[in-house]
Amino acid sequence: MTARMISICGLVMALMMASVLASSSRFQRVPQSQSVVENESVKFECESTDSYSELHYDWLHNGHRIAYDKRVHQIGSNLHIEAVRRTEDVGNYVCIATNLASGAREASPPAKLSVIYLESASVQLLGSNRNELLLKCHVEGASGDLEPLEIEWYRNSEKLSTWKNVQLDQHRLIIRQPGSEDDGLYRCTASNAAGRVMSKQGYVYQSSVKCLPRLPRRKNEKMMESWDKQTFLCRGKRGGAAGLEALPAAPEDLRIVQGPIGQSIIKEGEPTALTCLYELPDELKNQRIQLRWRKDGKLLRQVELGGSAPIPGHSFDSGKDALLREDARLVLHKQNGTLSFASIIASDAGQYQCQLQLEAHAPINSSPGILEVIEQLKFVPQPTSKNLELDAVVAKVHCKAQGTPTPQVQWVRDGENTTLPDHVEVDANGTLIFRNVNSEHRGNYTCLATNSQGQINATVAINVVVTPKFSVPPVGPIETSEQGTVVMHCQAIGDPKPTIQWDKDLKYLSENNTDRERFRFLENGTLEIRNVQVEDEGSYGCTIGNSAGLKREDVQLVVKTTGDGFAPEESGGDGFLVTRAVLITMTVALAYIVLVVGLMLWCRYRRQARKARLNDLSTKEAGGDQPDVAGNGKGSEQEPCLSKQHNGHSKSRSKSSGDAQKSDDTACSQQSRASKKSAHIYEQLALPRSGLSELIQIGRGEFGDVFVGKLKATLVTSPSDKDADTEKQHSNSENGSGGSGSGSTTLSTLNEKRRSKTSMDDIEEIKEEEQDQHNQSGLEQLVLVKALNKVKDEQACQEFRRQLDLLRAISHKGVVRLFGLCREKDPHYMVLEYTDWGDLKQFLLATAGKVNTATAGSSSPPPLTTSQVLAVAYQIARGMDAIYRARFTHRDLATRNCVISSEFIVKVSYPALCKDKYSREYHKHRNTLLPIRWLAPECIQEDEYTTKSDIFAYGVVVWELFNQATKLPHEELTNEQVVQRSQAGSLEWSVAEATPDSLREILLSCWVSNPKERPSFSQLGAALSKAMQSAEK
């Protein structure tokens, strides 16, 4: 009995323990099935409800215990898998919870892991005959448990959809009754959460040719080894065979270790980098080897790896399309071959591949990588409200959205997802179409654009209106007697109800500006005038309008006085009066036309005669040696901005010539004499266009393209010679052409030359000019060429002349020289001095390591020291002081508009590349591109440019120098915010951290709001000179 009781008690205790274990082993969180993109990480969560016992967790994969490593590890009770691999990690995962006290174990339900990947796509031909063409898009990839693969078909880059004889059936493309309009290259794209790929090869269909290239239909049959080269061979009637000339393979030890892998998905605006690790053997380092990056088969960036210096302008594949455009966002690192993007934009999406090219050998290609850009969801453009004309047959409201993936566009009315009204539909492009517009179509319509990023909306108001029309228009002319009464009718219909406004001689009439006792405005729009006066005579206009538009009708009121004998019975003579008035008017008009034509012919004859006399006189004075520069040229007849050229040089006239010209001067205005003077100045600057060579476009400015090229050294005149020639001509004009004045001319030339120097350093100025003369003994001079393309834009022409006069009037080593002006034909070229190191901003970025400028056998330049920065700022101050002393203003002073040479000589220049290269540094304000972050407040508010505003910009330039030009001034603010704060006087400036203490106060004074309190360039130069001396100590 006792034993039986003991067994019963043991059974009860076991049941109780089992119940406790069952309750304690229930899971609070169980692992969930997941689908993840390959190479991404995943986490399985597992947690038991038993918080009183010590538990141990294990994980099983497909029934086997997991061996943990760095990639697959357990944190607490959760399982973490880094860089998921589809070949190893796919399957079921089970969490095992073990009670260490009792040894009881509990298993969670299995969780399935599916891997999403996308490798490649190819087009396969399933069948082709006259009645049907059947293609299949074969994809190597999987979408897991998410949405299936999305397949898109393209013909010659045009996206196809089910239409007419084209049918899309899952992965297949069916074209029934194919014809010549279906000819082209067919390719397909596949996309899922892992990205998007396009078939590397396509299928070419051509209905009119019997020999068609065919894709292989067996998987083991090889395509071309190079994915970016496709050659289809077709033997013609003559039996000729096409082929490619093979190049020898590169050495095996020259190879690419790692290229861009798989597919990268980057959000718009984020930075990224593409890897290209390579091995370069020592025996090949002295040979020509190029590292290239290609995008969609086109050359994007390249760099020389070998020791041999590259030939300028030469490339191994110069005949191929290239995308070698200057873009500060893209940097190719020579050391490791990485292609880095500072910020991604939508156009960067594509297929990238790096390549090693040994001269005269076949290229070595890496595996291609796909860069997909997630474009921000936005409307392009924003939908706007619209007025629709009642009973219009068709009216459209557009709604276009962009984003990644492609957004779906739909319309709803009044914020509710209800059915649109009758005769309103939405086409495939998201356009809202109204047919047979009626009043029921009024309301608020919302456009919804949706993709995986979310949803955006824009609401527009649709109003149905009726264009105003005259139901009773004013009819005239109206004649009335003085002190009579006249009624001018004007009634209108429309929806909304039109308003009616009267005016007299284009001046609005209302009860406030008229005599209320005589003028009466009726509710229906009629104007009644009582007790008509003589001054009431004139042209009266009635304007009707509503939100749909405006219309106007005029009526003439004629007031007859009592003395004119106006009476109703005399109206029969009105016909004769009208006829006489018409005859008189026509006679006067004909006489005026004859007079104008006669004056035009006379002026043209006088101008040609005067031009002939000037040409003859110039030829005689030059001894017959001067060629006809532009007198007979076609280009000079069509110069819209600059004064026309004249033959030879303007010199002194003899007394008889002056008497012959005296009569012409009486017919010429002061403006024509000024035009002759400017023409003489431009003629001195004339350069033949044939002297320019190797022009390379580096950007676009406000009035045209900007180039860098070379100028024959024989055409470069030293500044001293130019000044002496000019001074000699002025002396001859004043003192006559006799030889006795040569001594005084030379003396005055030297004195004028010394006076033209700035007061900072005359001795260094003379040395600089002597060095320039010595340098001109070479064959060619590096120059900057600015083209005047906008010849019909008066503002652009005026700015072109201003820059020309500015650089012509200054001879200083701190300002670039003006070599000349090419005016033989359009466009005109302004030829300026340029340096071997280019613009200062790019130099600063290179020394800061932001731009890769390393060439073969060299390294990146080191950052500038404080002494070097002060030397650069001092030279710019000297150049700006020279501009100030010549009574000019620069208006666009910045590091981008200065140049630096390999001798560390800095000069103030004027490239002004505001349209592409430095477009971020300009903002369109009042219909003009302005460097608002460098402008003083008075320039933005009142368009007032002075030397003090140049000093304001100079302070910003020094700020750029100490920051190595790595960031924009106030880059945390938008352009609109900078303009608003500058106009409000709330834009705060502070000097750079590396600025010496001795310069902080004077630099801060450059930015004070009162221009009179800003320092001068001479004061800034003196402060910089002291700072340089202190830095040297």
Curated annotation (Swiss-Prot):
Tissue-specificity statement? Dynamically expressed during embryogenesis in several areas of the developing nervous system, including neurons and fasciculating axons. Expression in stage 7 embryos is seen in the anterior midgut primordia, cephalic furrow and along the germinal band. At stage 11, expression is in 15 stripes over the trunk region, and in the anterior and posterior midgut primordia. Stage 12 shows expression in the developing nervous system, procephalic lobe and maxillar bud. Stage 13 shows expression in the ventral cord, maxillar segment and in three regions of the gut.
Q: Which residues form the Protein kinase domain?
A: 692-1028
Spans within the Extracellular topological domain: 23-581
All residue ranges annotated as the Ig-like C2-type domain in the record? 25-114, 113-199, 251-365, 368-463, 468-558
| Pfam family for this entry, one | PK_Tyr_Ser-Thr
Statement: the UniProt record of this protein carries the keyword Cell membrane: yes
Which parts of this chain are annotated as the region Disordered? 617-679, 718-760
The record's section on InterPro entries has:
Ig-like_dom (IPR007110), Ig-like_dom_sf (IPR036179), Ig-like_fold (IPR013783), Ig_I-set (IPR013098), Ig_sub (IPR003599), Ig_sub2 (IPR003598), Kinase-like_dom_sf (IPR011009), Prot_kinase_dom (IPR000719)
Show the GO MF annotations. ATP binding; cell adhesion molecule binding; cell-cell adhesion mediator activity; protein heterodimerization activity; protein homodimerization activity; semaphorin receptor binding; transmembrane receptor protein tyrosine kinase activity; transmembrane signaling receptor activity
The UniProt disruption phenotype note reads: Axon guidance defects. R-cell differentiation and cell fate determination are normal, but many R1-R6 axons connect abnormally to medulla instead of innervating lamina.
Where's it mainly located?
membrane
Listed transmembrane segments: 582-602
The secretion signal range is 1-22
Q: Where in the cell is it found?
A: Cell membrane
List the keywords (alphabetical): Cell adhesion, Cell membrane, Disulfide bond, Glycoprotein, Immunoglobulin domain, Membrane, Neurogenesis, Phosphoprotein, Receptor, Repeat, Signal, Transmembrane, Transmembrane helix
| Annotated function | Acts as a calcium-dependent, homophilic cell adhesion molecule that regulates neural recognition during the development of the nervous system. Component of the repulsive Plexin signaling response to regulate motor axon guidance at the embryonic stage. Also component of a receptor complex that is required in the adult visual system to innervate the lamina layer; specific targeting of R1-R6 axons.
- Report what the protein is called: Tyrosine-protein kinase-like otk
Lineage in the entry?
A: Eukaryota, Metazoa, Ecdysozoa, Arthropoda, Hexapoda
